[in-house]
Amino acid sequence: MANVTLNVTDNQGKATGTVDAPAEIFGFSAEEVQSRIPLIHQVVIAQLAAARQGTHATKTRGMVSGGGRKPWKQKGTGRARQGSIRAPQWYHGGTVFGPQPRDYSQRTPKKMKAAALKYVLSDRANAGHVAVVDFGVSEAPSTKAAVAALTPVTENKFTTVVLSRENVNEWLSVRNIPTVHPIFADQLNTYDVVTAQYVVFSKEGFDAFLAAKAEPAAKEA
């Protein structure tokens, strides 16, 4: 596979050049991406499940306060027999088979998560929806400047913006834009790519992302 060429634009949305993106991350074909949809789906579902707190809880008849004595005698009243006013059929009674605290997380191997991210990034790159933008806010944060830089590239569509942790001004500039989800390069994940129509890297964010992906490869080698 050949490296993928991504457009680089300035703070006015004008093209200033290109940058090579590694084929092993951005270069999978549409057919390969299509064949990996079950993998992508599994990783996204696992990520959403892991985000659940799982603190929901209902009270069973044994947990509800009261109901210690039998409301009336077993026989002779003409009414149905009852053992407690906290039985499920009673108003303010306990809940039957209600939700209890649980852990929703699913085991997802690192290689699966890494592979899913590569395929969704390739899908966006194949559509021309991945770009590198110079926001031009290195001296002071400016949301107005960030909007001017992003609009020509993303057409105001929902965008995941990948930033470096070192450049705080870029984060402050884009965090309040309604159509933008900012994320640091080492946190980029499958879900945040799938839910966005465009993926935009800052220059430093792109370098940081590639550096983060190169470290595991170097360890395996």
Curated annotation (Swiss-Prot):
Residue numbers spanned by region Disordered: 56-83
InterPro entries according to UniProt: Ribosomal_uL4, Ribosomal_uL4-like, Ribosomal_uL4_dom_sf
SUPFAM superfamilies linked: Ribosomal protein L4
One MF term in the entry's GO annotations: rRNA binding
GO BP: translation
Alphabetically ordered keywords of this record: Ribonucleoprotein, Ribosomal protein, RNA-binding, rRNA-binding
One GO CC annotation: ribonucleoprotein complex
Subunit details: Part of the 50S ribosomal subunit.
NCBIfam families, sorted: rplD_bact (TIGR03953)
Function (record text): One of the primary rRNA binding proteins, this protein initially binds near the 5'-end of the 23S rRNA. It is important during the early stages of 50S assembly. It makes multiple contacts with different domains of the 23S rRNA in the assembled 50S subunit and ribosome.
Family the UniProt entry places it in: Belongs to the universal ribosomal protein uL4 family.
Protein name: Large ribosomal subunit protein uL4
Species, as recorded: Bifidobacterium adolescentis (strain ATCC 15703 / DSM 20083 / NCTC 11814 / E194a)
